[in-house]
From Swiss-Prot:
Name under which the protein is recorded: Putative efflux system component YknX
Keyword presence, Glycoprotein: no
Function: Part of an unusual four-component transporter, which is required for protection against the killing factor SdpC (sporulation-delaying protein).
Top-level taxon: Bacteria
Length: 377
């Protein structure tokens, strides 16, 4: 019996020991009021609204020269790939036998018109002499009367010949313009990017440019804006450019152009469909140009708005379903407070409603923090 009571006593002691350890492990450690957290309040910071748009590196200004069959036969390509050209540099020349014949015919017609006018002028002079002889015989008035109809006829012929000469001169000017067009010149200053001999000899089924000119030192990034974003993006806004290909680098730029009307090709493709229209966007790069070539893809982060706002570090704001919230510290306990947010950047989140400047917000809430939990700041 005595052994039984000793066993019961040992069991009770063990149970008490285990219970005390469980209590100690569940209770806060000595000298601590709960989980230690870092707190702070909302602060006024400058925050920017941004629009992210994919874009492509392109020449700011470029020229494509296509084969034009109506000009005649392509005689000569005067540049090669890599050549530097200035505005007005001859690129290609055409020959046109029909145009040469028309030009020669025009010259002959002009000579004929001039000869006709000279002949009529000689007849008028002869008529004046005839009139003076008649005056001696029948008097001045009678002489004028007899000569009048013949003079009127000659003057009419002369006027008609002069009109025909003017028409011939106009044709000559038109032909001169067409002859001038047989030499295609550069419209920009830049570098010959490519020369396509097959396009020049018409061997390609798809029309391709014979010559492509661009300026590698004058590049832009172009993209497309949605209807919604085009209301926010304006000319002159700052842009930060990044590339997945050229990692670890950023470039600065400004919006240089926003289309007033949708992209024509996009609009044509979207006719009769539910596709949203898109507006062309162009960004001018500042400073050093990217090492990439035209065609490289970039991401444009456009700063559309910059203002002062009440903010918290983004990691302090949590989300459950569609509701954003933070934890504040009140009377040593964490308290969940629902908030309404505005703009969000990588580091800051705008707080529009739900907090005051006096509220102490947990800046580093872990997943273990819960509403009503004892914390120490």
């Amino acid at each position: 019996m005595k052994k039984v009571w000793i066993g019961i006593g040992i069991a009770v002691i063990v149970a008490l020991f285990v219970g005390i350890n469980i209590y100690r492990s569940a209770a806060p450690t000595s000298g601590s009021a709960g989980k230690e957290v870092q707190t702070g309040s909302v602060e006024e910071n400058e925050i920017s609204s941004t629009v992210m748009v994919p874009g492509t590196l392109k020449f700011s200004n470029e020229q494509y020269v296509f084969y034009e069959a109506d000009k005649g036969t392509l005689e000569d390509i005067k540049v090669k790939e890599g050549d530097k050209v200035k505005k007005g540099t001859a690129l290609v020349t055409y020959t046109n036998e029909q145009l040469s014949l028309e030009k020669e015919q025009n010259q002959l017609t002009s000579e004929s018109n001039r000869l006709q006018i000279d002949q009529i002028q000689e007849k008028l002079k002869a008529l004046d002499s005839k009139e003076r002889e008649l005056e001696k015989q029948v008097g001045k008035k009678e002489a004028e009367k007899q000569i009048e109809s013949e003079r009127t006829e000659l003057q009419m012929q002369k006027k008609t010949a002069e009109i025909e000469l003017k028409q011939t001169e106009l044709q000559r000017q038109s032909l001169a313009n067409r002859v001038s067009d047989l030499e295609v010149k550069s419209e920009i200053e830049g570098t010959v990017i490519s020369v396509n001999q097959e396009a020049a000899s018409k061997k390609s089924d798809i029309q391709e440019p014979v010559i492509h000119i661009g300026n590698p030192k004058d590049l832009v990034v172009s993209g497309k804006l949605s209807e919604y974003d085009t209301l926010k993006v304006k000319k002159g806004q700052k842009v930060t450019l990044t590339s997945d290909v050229i990692q670890g680098k950023t470039w600065k730029g400004t919006v240089s152009a926003v289309g007033l009307v949708p992209d024509q090709q996009e609009s044509a493709a979207a006719q009769g469909t539910e596709q949203a229209v898109q507006y062309p966007l162009q960004v001018k790069i500042k400073g050093n140009l990217p090492e990439g070539k035209p065609g490289f893809k970039f991401i444009m982060n456009i700063e559309t708005d910059k203002r002062k706002a009440n903010t918290l570090p983004s990691k302090a704001v949590k989300k459950e379903d569609d509701q954003y919230y933070v934890y504040t510290v009140k009377d040593g306990k964490a308290k969940r407070v629902d908030v309404k947010i505005g703009e969000v950047t990588d580091d800051l989140t705008e707080i529009k409603e739900g907090l005051t400047q006096d509220d102490q917000v947990i800046l580093n809430p872990s997943d273990q923090v819960t509403d009503g939990m004892e914390v120490k700041s």
